[in-house]
Amino acid sequence: MAKKITGYIKLQIPAAKANPSPPIGPALGQHGVNIMEFCKAFNAKTQADEGTIIPVVITVYADRSFTFITKVPPMSVLIKKAVGIESGSSVPNKNKVGKLTREQVREIATKKLPDMNAASLEAAMRTVEGTARSMGVEIVN
């Protein structure tokens, strides 16, 4: 028989930088999860992507054990990395902070597709373009 699931915890943590301080400690502590065990496992698994924010879904079981799944970084993080900027524009329609090519849009959409609810790569590309526009990034051919 499968273990009984008592809850799911969704967090966004910088890769290889999980530590027991807030927000991780309190979120895991209230479910009775061994915080240090999670931090060590997460840091080991995300060592290659150091510095990038990684969404993680932690499944907590009745015996206080856990499993976790890491997901693809948020689309805005991927766009900022591709363009090479720290943050998006404060006035997206007036100030453009960078340019993104169609090829870069396709690359981001391909990477993010498993976590999206888009039916096709083209739909995912339109979603990436919309997010980029709302950040003040221009799409160029």
Swiss-Prot record:
GO terms for biological process: translation. Pfam families: Ribosomal_L11 (PF00298), Ribosomal_L11_N (PF03946). It comes from the Bacteria. SUPFAM superfamilies: Ribosomal L11/L12e N-terminal domain, Ribosomal protein L11, C-terminal domain. Belongs to the universal ribosomal protein uL11 family. NCBIfam families: L11_bact (TIGR01632). This is Large ribosomal subunit protein uL11. It comes from Geobacter sulfurreducens (strain ATCC 51573 / DSM 12127 / PCA). The lineage of its organism: Bacteria, Pseudomonadati, Thermodesulfobacteriota, Desulfuromonadia, Geobacterales.
